[in-house]
Amino acid sequence: MNKLVIAILFFVLTLGVYAQKKDFYGSNFTVKYPANFTAEGSMPSANNDDTFVSAIFTSPDKKVSFYIYSPNTPALPTDITIKEGFGVPLASSGKKKSKNKVYATSFYEPKDGFTHSYLITCDENDRVTKVVGRRYKTIKDLNASDKLYDEFKKSFQNRKIRK
């Protein structure tokens, strides 16, 4: 009986931790990430204001990381590797009149042993305005993180309007 109560309590507490979110405030964006992940600013803002234009959020077991990049001015990130010639637009994003394009790139098992996958959003002049992605060890890790990753992507909010 005690083992059952302990197991149920552990499940409920674990579920609560996974459901909780924290906010990360970047230079010009906010994103919600799982409370049990570790957040680390990656690429400093050029504004010299102790903020970041990109961040990495790593799971407690270090098998999955989420990535977000939202530059102050459109440009490629320099803190990750983006495969050159990243491809054909996947879909239009935003309002019907928007000319933003979403591109995809991914590369498998570089030297670090993770699979990396990124969605790159570009403006009408093909300048990068946002990159969101993740890296993972195995397909099992990928599948286990799907819901959290979808919530992470949907939580992105741009706080400044780019010129």
Residue ranges and their predicted role:
Residues 20, 37-38, 130-163:
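Surface-exposed amphipathic alpha-helical segments
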Residues 20, 27, 53, 91, ...:
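Residue-level marker for the onset of beta-strands and adjacent loop->beta junctions
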Residues 25-27, 32-76, 108-110:
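Secretory pathway targeting signatures of secreted, lumenal, and periplasmic proteins
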Residues 42-44, 76-81, 140-144:
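A short, polar/proline- and glycine-enriched secondary-structure boundary/capping micro-motif
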Residues 78-129, 136-139:
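Signature of long, low-cysteine stretches enriched in small and polar/charged residues
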Residues 19-22, 51-54, 97-107:
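Short, hydrophobic/aromatic-rich segments at coil-to-beta transitions
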Residues 4-15, 19:
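Sec-dependent N-terminal signal peptides
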